[in-house]
Amino acid sequence: MIQFPNAKINIGLNIVDRREDNYHNLETVMYPVSLRDALELVEAKDLKFTSSGISIPGNSNDNLCLKAYHLMASDHKLPPVHIHLHKHIPIGAGLGGGSSDASFLIKLINKKFGLNLSDSVMESYASEIGSDCAFFIKNKPVFAYGKGNQFRDIELDLSKYFLVLVMPPLHVSTAEAYRGISIRPVSRHLTELMNLAPEEWKHQVKNDFEDSVFPKFPQIAGIKSTLYNAGAVYASMSGSGASVYGIFDKETTLPDLERENQVFYGV
């Protein structure tokens, strides 16, 4: 059985305050996009995880897909399986690829083995793996708050726009991005701003991580500027980077950006 875990982008990201547990409270809109991995699950003699495509750093035994399997196996009698992940979503990009893979595995296990778990139960499993994992269970636009693990549905449809995603050959440390953050009050609530057309977002919908990341990585700032110069109605870094997306009102190509970056069109 195979499924295709998709990426997400963050539209606006406000760091609200620092919590007593040293995490931060934030507000952001998460929006699913069509850039996808491929995830296959088959029964096997022994539990096994393999991958292809983009090389996944670290020990494969620490992969979030295996973590999801073990989490569900602790509550349900599951047979050994072979999990194969073909990685296409860039890693360390602020696109939630690893979280999506783990959440889609939860959905795969639920379907393949007839567990008949509700979305809320699967969200509970996913939230134990990572703060944004539960988003990918329902996989529709939400306003996320708290640590980024509490969600409220919103109406947002960008299907009439052309989205371009740019991934530079850079890695941004999320911890380092947080260290450079200056917490500032917001003048208008993000859910209110989502009632505006994307053409009105440029000077109002901000990603707070850009203030700490752009000075250290001017190449990422340059990508955002290039997207606007090419006609994007809105452009932003996703999450803590390093990817940047542009929302265009018509199909476009960006050969200048293709020379040094991965560029994904029509996501």
Can you say where each PLM-predicted feature lies in the sequence?
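Contiguous, small/hydrophobic- and glycine-enriched helical/loop subdomains that border
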Residues: 102, 106-143
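Short beta-strand scaffold segments in enzyme catalytic cores
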Residues: 13, 37-41, 132-136, 142, ...
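Residue-level signal for inorganic ion chemistry
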Residues: 11, 39-41, 65, 98, ...
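ATP-binding N-lobe of GHMP and related small-molecule kinases
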Residues: 1-93, 111-120, 155-157, 167
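Conserved, helical-rich catalytic subdomain that frames metal- and/or nucleotide-binding sites
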Residues: 49, 138, 143-234, 249-259, ...
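Glycine/serine-rich anion-binding loops at beta->alpha junctions
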Residues: 84-113, 131, 233-245
